[in-house]
Regions:
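Glycine-rich flexible loops
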Residues: 1-360
Length: 360
C-alpha cells in the first residue's frame, strides 16, 4: 500500500468534498494530529481540533449546512445511517469535545471527525443530509427522530462491526485477496459496476446501500457487507438461494439480503434490486412520508430496525405491488427487470423528491 504524504491526503479530501459541493472557503482539515490545513492548502496552527481523539477532522459546510447555521440547533438522528455514524445527536458547540463524532459550530460550519478518509467523506455527506432535512422537511411533514437507545446500539454496531473492513483497508491491514474463478462472472461485474454508478449518481455514501441481480429462479447475487464499492471484486459478490437465504460459508453478504430475497421470492418479473440512501429521499424517509407525483408512486413502508425481519417484511410488502418504496427512517429501494431499469427509477425518484422539496 502506497503511503501518501499529508499534503497529498489533504488534496484528496479537498477534491472529493469539492466534487460533492461540501467544500467551504473557510474550511480547515486535519489529516493527522499536528497536520492541519486551510482551504487553500496552507498549513495552520489551531486549537479547534485539540480535543479530537480521531486522527482526521474537517470544518466545512455545504449548501444546506450554511442555511441551517442561520438558526443552529442540535440535530437528532432521524435515519439509521445518521444514527450509525453520529449516535443520538449532533450537538452545537464552539469546538468539538473528546468523543464527538460531529458537532455544529455556530457561524463557522460543521466539524466531523473520522478514523479514515472514506469515513470522513461519508460523515460530511450524512451531516449535510441532516441539515437538508432540517431546512426542507416542513414542506412535507415532520421528521421522526429515532429513540436514543436504538441510536446508541446502531452507532456501536457501526463502530465495532460494520466499518471494520473499511478501517482495515485504510490501515493497510487487509490480507492479500484470494483470486479465484467464480461462476456468473459477467453478472457479478455488472453488480459491481452498478454499485459504482450509485456512488457516481450520489445515491449512496461509503458502504451504505446495496445492489443485487437475479441469476435464475433459484438464486441471486448481492454485494458484500461493509466493503467500499471501489474495492469490491467479483469473488466478493455473494450468491444466495432464494428459497432459504443460504450462502457459502465464509462469505459476508449485505445485511439487507433478506429484503432482496423476499422481493425475488414474491415477484418473478424482478431481476434487479437497488437500495439507496440518497439525500432528498432520505428527507421523505425521515418524515415517514410517501412520494407521489405524476411520474412517481413510492409508498412509505412502516419502520423496522435496520436489518431486522420487520424491516424486510414491511418493505417487501410494499414491493409486492409497487416498483419503488421509501423505507421509514432508513432509505429507498427500487426494483426492475434489469439493473439499468432499477437505477433509472432510483435516479428519477431522487430528482422528483428534490424538485418537490426545493419548489418555491
Amino acid at each position: 500500500m502506497t503511503q501518501l504524504s499529508v499534503q497529498e491526503r489533504f488534496s484528496s479530501v479537498r477534491a472529493r468534498l469539492e466534487a460533492l459541493g461540501l467544500w467551504d472557503a473557510d474550511a480547515l482539515v486535519r489529516i493527522a494530529p499536528g497536520a492541519v490545513f486551510r482551504a487553500g492548502g496552507e498549513p495552520v496552527e489551531t486549537d479547534l481540533f485539540s480535543a479530537v481523539s480521531a486522527p482526521m477532522a474537517v470544518l466545512t459546510a455545504g449548501r444546506y449546512a450554511r442555511e441551517f447555521l442561520r438558526k443552529p440547533h442540535a440535530l437528532r438522528a432521524e435515519t439509521d445511517d445518521a444514527a450509525q455514524m453520529f449516535g443520538v445527536r449532533v450537538p452545537v458547540r464552539t469546538s468539538p469535545r473528546r468523543g464527538d463524532t460531529a458537532c455544529i459550530v455556530p457561524d463557522r460550519g460543521f466539524v466531523v471527525t473520522a478514523r479514515f478518509e472514506n469515513e470522513l467523506i461519508a460523515a460530511c455527506i450524512l451531516l449535510e443530509k441532516l441539515c437538508m432535512t432540517a431546512c426542507l422537511s416542513h414542506r412535507i411533514g415532520a421528521p421522526k427522530a429515532l429513540s436514543a437507545p436504538l441510536c446508541l446500539m446502531e452507532h456501536a454496531v457501526y463502530r465495532k462491526k460494520y466499518s471494520r473492513p473499511s478501517l482495515a483497508a485504510a490501515r493497510g491491514e487487509e490480507s492479500a485477496p484470494e483470486t479465484r474463478e467464480v461462476p456468473d462472472l459477467a453478472l457479478r461485474e455488472s453488480v459491481i459496476a452498478y454499485g459504482k454508478k450509485l456512488a457516481e449518481n450520489r445515491l449512496i455514501q461509503a458502504t451504505w446501500g446495496n445492489v443485487s441481480a437475479r441469476i435464475d429462479e433459484n438464486r441471486f447475487l448481492i454485494t458484500p457487507s461493509g466493503v467500499d464499492y471501489d474495492r469490491i471484486r467479483p469473488e466478493d459478490i455473494v450468491e444466495i438461494r432464494i428459497s432459504d437465504g443460504s450462502f457459502a460459508a465464509g462469505q459476508r453478504p449485505s445485511s439487507e439480503r433478506e429484503l432482496h430475497r423476499l422481493v425475488y421470492a414474491q415477484r418473478g418479473d424482478i431481476r434487479a434490486v437497488i437500495h439507496t440512501h440518497s439525500a432528498a429521499l432520505q428527507t421523505f424517509a425521515a418524515c415517514r412520508e410517501s412520494l407521489r407525483t405524476p411520474e412517481i408512486d413510492a409508498p412509505c413502508a412502516s419502520y423496522g430496525v435496520s436489518v431486522s425481519k420487520k424491516l424486510a417484511e414491511s418493505a417487501s410488502g410494499v414491493l409486492r405491488s409497487h416498483d419503488l418504496c421509501i423505507m421509514a427512517n432508513h432509505g429507498f429501494i427500487a426494483v426492475g427487470a434489469d439493473l439499468e431499469t432499477a437505477l433509472v427509477r432510483a435516479v428519477t425518484a431522487e430528482n422528483a423528491a428534490k424538485r418537490l422539496l426545493e419548489a418555491e
